[in-house]
Every structure is written in C-alpha cells, then in structure tokens.
C-alpha cells in the first residue's frame, strides 16, 4: 500500500521506484530548510514519508484500525517556556507553574490499569516502544491534560497557544535542535549524561541520553519510566534534581535535567580525603532530610551513595538517579495528603555493594530502612575517607556486610561513632529511624522543621583532623530520646503522610514553605506499641532466671556465674558427673583432675570472683562443654600454652599467691601454681579403642595408648649441622609454631642459650651438663628398601628441593645449567679489566637458591613415609612393604620411634623467605638428629594441633624428672668441695646465703637450667652468669637494687662484706676468694 501526501492510503502496492523517489524528495526538502531560522517549528516542515517506516509496524497499525498520523523526529510536548521579557513580568508564579512540564499524563506512565506502581508488565518490544513514546510524551496534542492547547495556523505554520480562559500566552516549544550538546559529564549503567546549552538563553542543562534500542533489548524500559515518574513527583523539592523536559528522536530518549556544576559528593570527599565534623554535620543533615522527604512521598531510593548525590552551584546536595527507586502505593484515597506504608517489602536485588543493607543479602528483602543504612555508610565515609565495608571484590564486600564487620579509624569522633554504631545494626528493629537520627546529639543545634538546614550557608570544606573536642564522649542522658520505640510493628506505625513541597522556584520562595509545620510529618510516627504475649519457652527461661537471682541473694557468700554461662557450666558439670558414673574405676580425685575445666597449665593466675576488684583479670580457659555450647565467650581468651622445652617445661611459681576462691559445681579458676602430686590424666587417654587403634594395635604399648593422627608425607632425616648450613644459605630460621601460642621466653634468651644461633644446640646446658644417649630420644630400625613399595622406595630428591619446594626436573635443570655459569665465571675471571669479577659479580648476579644448595657436598634424600602420633607422645614413622611381613603379618615396617615428650625434643616450624620458595615443613629436633616433615598447609596446621596436645599432656611427668635431676645435681655439687655453690639454688645441704635487702623468689630454686649449666672450667663462668641473669629477668618479679654502701665502709674501693650486685656478681675479688670465704664461714 502507498501513502499519499494527505496521509490517505492508496490500494496500489509500494514499488521500489517509489522508495527512491521519496528519498530524493526528502533530501531536497532537507536542503531547502537547512538555512532557515532554527526557531522555526519542526511541525511546519514537510514530514518524512511514512513509506520509510517498518513494514511490521504498518501492518500492526492497520489491524488496530487507527488513523495513520506522521510522527515528528523531535517531540515538543514537554517544553521549556521561553517568554519575552515583557510577558514574563506580567505572569505570576501560578501561571508559570501551569505551563511547566508538570503534566499529569506522565504520572501514570509506569502504572497499570488498577493504578499500582512497580508491577511486572509485558516485556514485549512493541509495548516497550509504546512506553518509550509515552515517556517522551504523546504526539497527540489533544490528548494532553495540560490547560494549554496547541493548534497550527495553516497560514503561518507557527504554533499558537490557546487557553481555555480568555488570557492568551505565546509559548515557544523547544526540541533537540534548540540545544548545543557539549562534553560528557556522567555515565550510568544504561545512559550518558551530557552538558546541553540552550542556544537562545545560554542556560546550561544536564541532558540524560538513553539509547532506546538498548533499553528494549536489556528490558530497562521499566526503570526509565519509574525514574521519570519519581522525578515528576519530586520536581518541586530543593533536595532532588529537577526534570525540565523529555523528548526523543529515532534512536535516543532525552531527559533534560537540572545541571549541578560542582559535581558529585564522592568527588568532593576524594579531593579532600575526608570532611571535618562541621561539614559532615551540614551535609549529613541535608541527606537525611532529603531521605525523609522521599519517604514522605512514598518513594524509596534504594541506591543512595555519594555518586548519586550532586552538589549544585550553592554547594547544596541534590539526589539523582531514581531508576531503581521503589514507588509505593497510597493506602488512602486522599489526593492532598496521601499516606504510604513504608513497611512494604521489595525483593528486587538493587543497589551498590558497599552501601547495600544486610537484610537484602541475608533475607532477600528490603524496605525503607535500606536508605537509612546507606546514610550510615556515607556518614562513616565522610570522616574515615572510605566506606565501612570495603574489600578487594564484591563477594568479600558482601561477606563483610552480612556480618556487619567494620572498624573505626583511629581518632574517629566519639559522637559520630555513637551515631554510626546505632545505624549500622543488623537487626532492623534496633536500627535508628529518621526521627531518632534527627534527635541525636550530633544534630542538637539544627532545626529540621523550619528548613534551616537548606537555608544555611555551606561551611568551609576542610579535611578531618583529630582534636580534643572530637574525642569528647557522649554527654550523659543525651541519648535518652533515642530509646527504641520498636519499629518492628506493621500497618499504621509505618504510615506516613506526604510532605508539602515548595514552589519550583527555590530562589523566589522561602524554605519555610517547604517545611510547613501544619503539613510536615515525620517519616516514622511515634506510636506506643502493645507488648506481645510471651510464649511458654520464654516464660520458663525468665522464671529460671528469677529463681537464680533469688538464690544468689539468699546466699551472699557464695558466688555463682550468671546468665548463659551458668547454664553452660551446669551442663558441663552434668557431663562430668555422667563420665564419672560411666567409669567407676577412677577415683574422685583423678576424675576431678582429668576434667578439662579443672586442668590448667601451671603458672596461670586465678581469676578473681569479683570483677569490680580486678577488672582486667584474665579469664581462665573454659571447659570443653562450655566451648562447644553456643555461649558468648569471655572478653579475653588466653593464648594456648606453648610446647615444652628444656627451658620452659617447668613452670615458675609466681612470687605472690592469691587465696583460691571456688565457684559452685565447676572449678573455672585455675589451680594453685604448685606441683601436683597426682598424675594428670589426659583427655586423649580414653579406655575406649577406635578403628585406628585396632589397625595399629601391634605397635601400641597398652590399651590406654591411642592413635591421634596418621598421615602420609615427605620425610627426611638429617644432622643439625647440615640443616643449619642449608638454612643459612636460604636465610631461613626455625621458630616456635604460631599455633602453639606466645613463647614464654624472649628472643634474647633464645640467642643467649643457643650460642648466637636461635635454633642451635651450641652451649646448650642439656648437652654439656646432663647429656643423654641417642636411644632416649628415638629408636631406629633398619629396613630393606628393596622390599618396599615404589612410592616408599624411590627417593624424592635432595633436602634442598624439599626446602625450596622445587620439583626434580626443575632442580636437574638448575644443576645442568650451573656448569655453563661456572664457565662464564672462569672466563670473566680471566679478564682482568672486567668490572664485574669475583665478589662484585656475585654481589650483582646472585645465584638461585637451588644452585646455592646444590653446591654443598652433603646430599640428604627424602622419601614418602606414613607417620602415626599416639597419646603417649610417640611419633612412629612407617614404610610400606610390597608384601606383608611374615612375622607380624603387617604391610608397614617401623623405621623410627621418636619420643616427643623427652626433654630436649623440640617442635619447630621451618620458615624461609618467599622468594626462595614456599613450603610447609615441621621439624622435630633432638640433640642428635632432626626429622623434617613436608606436606600441604592444611595438613601442617593439623599436625601442629596434635603435637600441641601431646606436649601439653605430659606436664607433671617432666616436672618430676626436673625435681629428680635437681636433687642429683645438688648432691653432686655438695660432694665437691672446690666448686662454688650459687646462692640462687637453695638446698638443705648447702650453706645459706647471707641475707639480701630484697625478697628472693623461690622460683629460681626449682629451675634446672642453671644447675645443669655448671662447669668447673672458668671459661663457662660468663655463660652461667648470663644464664642466671636471663632466668631472673624472665621469671622473677622486679627486684629492687641493693643499696650502695657508704664510702666509709669501702676498702680499696670495695665494700668490706660481700654484697650482691647485678648480673649475679658479688663484690669478692675473684671466684677463689669467694669460695675461700664460704669455707671459713
């Protein structure tokens, strides 16, 4: 079919020649009108032929039997009024308001037939295209509900404005041709914001350009219609960006918005890093008041962030980007004062990761309180300069938001800190409402009802600096108004009334009009809430709590734990009682000592029963049942005890003791720090055997020994000298495992006792004074490698590869490449003029770790082995055979049996720099050999956990050995007459030292490190003196210095009598004289 010039349909079909003629005519008309005045109306120009339109659209329109009307390239329904100066003076504000864009036709764009917003609708492309047409405005002038009607004069072809009243107004409509588009000032998810300047008035606007094809393809038409509806609804507010006009062309849709020349709020914070308290108060008040205005008009923004807060020419905030807003339906039929239910939930996942609320992530819903959460995040960012929930990616950010995991920066103002802590709350019912935020002490000098937050001059922008005023705490009683008024009610408690808006011309009207006291209503009404009836379970818990309080009042002398802890302790006591009944063979004393609640490492001070007397007392470790139950832990959890070593296996008795105060039923407090005469039974020593115990029962000593863990890993045995050389070349070190907790000796004492090497055995007292044979530490069985499986028989490589975590191939390549480098070195050494020769070349061209280690002569191979750790402190190393052993009928052959509980055996973790490689190596050190275990990170952590259990379960056994050893050393010392007896070691046979001016701790007498380090040689004297000094500094309380004698009592500069001075020295002239004096005495 063919369309004539008068838009009448012709039955003749459309021919290709017709299309060519129409295109030629179109170009001719375009050239003809290109030189005309730009104010010439677009409707007066000849229209483009409708034969160039989509054929599918034509067929669809034919079915609907609608008259085919040509559509202009630029729609001019929504316009910017352009008055002459004389006409503007004669028009009042109401008349200007009448001809503005505020047409009611746009307000129902996103609504359905029943008038409800935000509902799903058909996403058909044709419906989307019609929706876009409606957003830009209908082409039918007579359908508009404006009071101004536009008609065309056939003679002049210029628009004439006719009003239903007698007054007439000359209005010039503007389209896309009337603006000059400049640079891009913003970019959104599906739009681009450009600077548009009016050609006539030179006034600048922000033109938001949206691609219609993209909107239809990505199903974003709904968001565009919501944004226009929200902007039209809030168009008269100073806190929201104004929408002046909407128009379109064939490819794009245009929103002509208010231009904010000072950019967004995020750029301001990035420029200054942070904002001081005055600026934060000024902008926070405007933001929270703008959010209140949105909620009072039934709009939830749902994407409030600094990027969506603009700054106008007066440095006041403007909210923008309402594409993801939630439009609430009014609950009443009142047009003047509609009410909205803010508790309406939405399940749409919208927002930005750093500002999204936790209820959306945890419970997949959100309501009006998501805007309050975002406000709290922005307030935090104003001071800290970064959002409270920030991570490297969105997933980690969401994890922090879900857990409400954030930390205040140092020097954060205490008043703002209090406000942020009450806003960023996971529980919605405990989160502050807008009315409570406005009543907070932070906004005490502001009045939100008279609009003064918008009329005040903005303060000077300055970054935040800590000062004495910011560190002032919240005044007492200032937050009484913030007592929660329970916002968890539904229905009327969330009904808000629409707040009145001011005139669109903010400059010509006062701010008090916007916030009229008669029409203003707070977002959350303060309504008293009826108490919910308590259920039976809650009533029973409350009754038990009352009974417990009454019992404690009746028994003032007996203190019992309260709250959830008492319930957990009662459960622990019941469990202990049940265990005692199931095993009647054990005595009551042993059962009490075996309880995890009563077992505590010696030296731990008792927790006082009164928290007021010692508020900083450390809490002792709780029982296993308490830890397993969901009970809040105490504010301080003591570190785990470190492994037992020859220097710290024996716990020092503190110089002061406190009287023990028992709790009821269970002993939470640690026992007195004295040596127990009862054998402490380990929790792992259970009489019941498990599956692993039965499998390895041939190698277990008795039924009480149990298998704690089995693992297959790389195993290597080496001497300490070899290991030390390889570690020195790798800059590695052996340290106490981090899982064992804080070591009880300082780094200085480690250096002193190891002769300058932290991990060595040089000058170790255990090796010089009281050495043991190799069999006491481990036993070794010879195995035939030919009988083993291939995995256990084939060597894995050298120890160097194990330390640097290098594969065999890579290591061989390094070995093959090393001769080439040696040749190069020899050639460079022959050149005498070469600058990089000898040591200088080694300095600038260091060799790799594998090359350095491969140059050593010692080769130590590692193999695959299976290790078994038992509750008796045994570390068994097995090799797997191809055929079962004919004697034992087992496929595993025992190679090493290491005693982990033997004094002198240490558990270490080998650490090397990252550039040398990565490994996870456990080292078991003995004075003779070192055993290295290599596995992955997860298994290494589990191994250290089991090793810690083993070491901590043998405290009393080591204490007994130390006492016996001390007694033997004392006997040996007293039998020799020519050997000096240190005064720090008390014994019944040794002469008592002369009285000192300060109290001496008895702890030194029980430590064997000094007694074992005694040597008759004079060369060892300095090491003994330094050892005594280290032990005294670590274990004893602070001693008072001895008084300096008077000069009259000095003989040749020395006192007449022996006076003990620092470092364990006395004033005797030499060691022999002191011993001689002791004989005479």
UniProtKB/Swiss-Prot annotation:
Keywords: ATP-binding, Cytoplasm, Endocytosis, Kinase, Nucleotide-binding, Nucleus, Phosphoprotein, Serine/threonine-protein kinase, Transferase
Main location: nucleus
GO CC, alphabetical: cell cortex; nucleus
CDD domains assigned: STKc_PDK1
Compositionally skewed regions (Low complexity) per UniProt: 564-575, 582-602
GO molecular function: ATP binding; protein kinase activity; protein serine kinase activity; protein serine/threonine kinase activity
Modified residue annotations for Phosphoserine: 138, 619, 1009
GO BP: cell integrity MAPK cascade; endocytosis; intracellular signal transduction; late endosome to vacuole transport via multivesicular body sorting pathway; positive regulation of cytoplasmic mRNA processing body assembly; regulation of nuclear-transcribed mRNA poly(A) tail shortening
Basic and acidic residues: bias regions: 527-538
Subcellular location: Nucleus; Cytoplasm, Cell cortex
InterPro entries for the chain: Kinase-like_dom_sf, PDPK1, Prot_kinase_dom, Protein_kinase_ATP_BS, Ser/Thr_kinase_AS, Ser_Thr_kinase_AGC
Family named by the database record: Belongs to the protein kinase superfamily. AGC Ser/Thr protein kinase family. PDPK1 subfamily.
UniProt-listed PANTHER family: 3-PHOSPHOINOSITIDE-DEPENDENT PROTEIN KINASE 1-RELATED, SERINE/THREONINE-PROTEIN KINASE
General function of this protein: Serine/threonine-protein kinase which is part sphingolipid-mediated signaling pathway that is required for the internalization step of endocytosis by regulating eisosome assembly and organization, and modulating the organization of the plasma membrane. Phosphorylates and activates PKC1. Activates YPK1 and YPK2, 2 components of signaling cascade required for maintenance of cell wall integrity. Required for stress-induced P-body assembly and regulates global mRNA decay at the deadenylation step.
Name of the protein described by the UniProt record: Serine/threonine-protein kinase PKH2
Source organism of this protein record: Saccharomyces cerevisiae (strain ATCC 204508 / S288c)
Gene responsible for this protein: PKH2
